[in-house]
Amino acid sequence: MNKQLTNNGFRLTQRGLQIGKYMYRTYQNVKRIQKGGPDSFKAAEDFVKDTSEIGVIAVKMSQFLSARSDIVDERTLKVIERLQSEVPPEKESPPDFTFYEWYKEPIASASIATVYKGKRKTDNSDVILKRVRPEVKQRIMEDLPLFIIVLDIAKFFGVPGAENMLEIVRECQPVLLGELNLKLEAKAMSLFKKKFASIPWLTIPTVYEAGETYMISEYVPSKKITAAYPNEMLARRLFELYIYMTIDIGLVHADPHAGNIGIKKDGTFVLYDFGAIIDVRDAKQYIAKCLKSVVIGDTDGVVRSLEDMGVIKSGGSVARLKKAIPKIKKIMESEDFNVELSKLPEFTSNENRIFELTTRYIYLIRSLTIVEGIISYHDRDFSLTKYIKKYNDIIDDIVEVPAIDIVKEIAGDFLTTPASLKNMNDLVFSMKDEISTEIADAKKIARYGFAMFLLIEIIKML
């Protein structure tokens, strides 16, 4: 038993050193990318190669960074975008199923799962198999604590950017854990299909069967929304879709990058990948009020809505928020809403922030930021204020909904939702408990590991 613990400790120490070196190399590569010039191309290749090799958490961290223009510059963002399409495919063949057969080569490969196309033998229809990569759960459970420890150490020593990176790791933790169970994704996908059945220009593939590590669904071909020629109709539809998600239905697709939003030849939207869903049903009324208040310039209304949402840090922040609202309204009318917003210290500076954002609001902001970028591609004159005004009727309807009706709606959804989806929070929290245990164990060897790392680096410099 002691020997096993020693071996495990040694293995985790080695992995921790590997992650520490990766973080150091990434820090150096990002600085080279930011400088530009010929050396930046080599740095970009090194960054993508190192991130792909270190594993799923590094890839996910990088993808989360792509929505944080307050942390990462434009050059680095373009490099990070490559990680959505340059994840090496797994080498194992797809599993055998009695009623299905699969092509050996995957049609898509992500950090957590691989997607194969195949045929259903009963009717020869095209289907899709999504499968969690082998051993990815074990890798996540081991690496998350080590990333946190390495970044904690870097933060302690005042390494630039360590605090923001630590924040990113903590942000992506719930999504990572939720994406490990494809049975939960299948239930969420079916729930979305039911909720959005009334939208004629939206398709959500039908799920045929699912288990914890696999999901088989309808094959719906399309092209990426950003592969379509810029079209204002697509911009309006995407905005309308996310307005409905956020303030009407209250369930929001949390990973709306271009690969997960397809366009069919007739202009119909196709949504893929429901591994991460944001539930804001209990807050959608306040979000609607906040949007309306911003548009009409009601500063007190904005503050009240944000207080109802529980996102203002303290009483002292309210006065600063009121001063910032005119700036925010002006920024909402600009073409580069996200870029300009990221320049306000009230949103970005660790010392001056006025918001205490919970995980779901962080994901909501991230999702809407990505959507904003896609909308701006299709409508160069995009203005958030202008678009919101077109949906005043929807916003007014939500603002007037009594709180008891929202409670009834959530309760109704809960009662008709399969047990496996109801237990999603329990699953995530149990995994977080496992990770907390891993962190406690890893901290015991952190000092030794970090000392060894410093010693090795000093020897290399001599």
UniProtKB/Swiss-Prot annotation:
Q: Name one GO cellular component term.
A: membrane
One Pfam entry for this protein is ABC1
InterPro entries (UniProt xref): ABC1_dom, Kinase-like_dom_sf, UbiB_kinase
Upregulation: Expressed in the early phase of the viral replicative cycle.
A GO biological process this protein is involved in?
regulation of response to reactive oxygen species
Source species of the chain = Paramecium bursaria Chlorella virus 1 (PBCV-1)
SUPFAM superfamilies for this protein: Protein kinase-like (PK-like)
* UniProt xrefs under PANTHER family: CHAPERONE-ACTIVITY OF BC1 COMPLEX CABC1 -RELATED, PROTEIN ACTIVITY OF BC1 COMPLEX KINASE 8, CHLOROPLASTIC
What is this protein's record name?
Putative ABC transporter A445L
Similarity comment text for this entry: Belongs to the protein kinase superfamily. ADCK protein kinase family.
